[in-house]
């Protein structure tokens, strides 16, 4: 899959040597023809082989940037900023040479039974003018880097059960 994506991108004059190659004019041209083309970039990031040295370096950088940005989000107090903050996180990581992709999707949160809190859903919708149910960053070695889930609008004590930073390797 990875080599097929590399061939396709190169055939269309899209260089793949930098984490933000989706900003290349030829990539943008393809995305204008096919709005789902950005998914190919995410697949490229997911399928790309990474060295152990890269993974070790990336893990440290991702953790440090997520920690700083999470604190900024908490200090700001803005709720429901998942799309914006995930975009900012991915851009900072790209500037630091980290391969990543912003993921927009849905999210279900089940709370411990003792909490007496009901399951919370952030659903994506295929109809209407909605950006996303929720957004996070995929940045190998992490499948999920989410610094905004706790900063959504919740009722009751739900926030008490959600970590400020979620970093999952195998999702």
Summary of predicted features, one role per range:
Residues 1-171:
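A structural boundary/capping signal
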């Amino acid at each position: 899959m990875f080599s097929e994506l590399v061939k396709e991108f190169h055939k269309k004059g899209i260089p793949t040597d930098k984490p933000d190659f989706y900003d290349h004019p030829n990539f943008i041209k393809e995305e204008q023809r096919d709005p789902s083309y950005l998914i190919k970039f995410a697949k490229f990031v997911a399928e790309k082989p990474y060295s152990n040295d890269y993974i070790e370096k990336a893990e440290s950088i991702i953790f440090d940037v997520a920690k700083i940005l999470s604190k900024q989000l908490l200090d700001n107090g803005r709720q429901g900023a998942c799309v914006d903050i995930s975009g900012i996180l991915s851009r900072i990581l790209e500037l630091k040479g980290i391969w990543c992709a912003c993921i927009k999707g849905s999210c279900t949160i089940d709370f411990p039974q003792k909490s007496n809190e009901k399951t919370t859903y952030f659903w994506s919708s295929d109809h209407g003018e909605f950006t996303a149910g929720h957004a996070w960053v995929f940045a190998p070695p992490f499948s999920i880097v989410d610094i905004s889930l706790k900063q959504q609008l919740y009722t009751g004590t739900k926030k008490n059960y959600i970590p400020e930073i979620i970093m999952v390797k195998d999702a």
